[in-house]
């Protein structure tokens, strides 16, 4: 598959499941509302949550978290990778 097809599938999946994805993020992003969260952080979390819990071909959580953290290092602030790792890590640990 072309990467553009994969990107479109992920975007469509995030949009189709946005309420459930945002509810899950809100549950684990303690002291952060989605509105207060930087857009980059919020959208990295949305993609990772979709890939781990909602996609037809789910990613192994460690792979999804590592990808999200690497993207956060490029596009986020200095605090973004730690924040992303913390939220997703809590989510995965509680989902076991």
Model segments located where?
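Short, small-residue-biased leader/transition segments that mark boundaries at the very start
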Residues: 1-3
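Membrane topogenic helices and adjacent juxtamembrane segments
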Residues: 7-9, 13-22
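Short alpha-helix boundary/capping elements
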Residues: 15-19, 53, 92
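PIN-domain endoribonuclease scaffold, especially VapC-family toxins
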Residues: 20-25, 29-31
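Short amphipathic alpha-helical boundary/capping segments
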Residues: 31-37
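C-terminal non-catalytic interaction appendages of large macromolecular assemblies
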Residues: 37-38, 54-96
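SAM-dependent transferase fold signal centered on methyltransferase-like domains
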Residues: 42-53
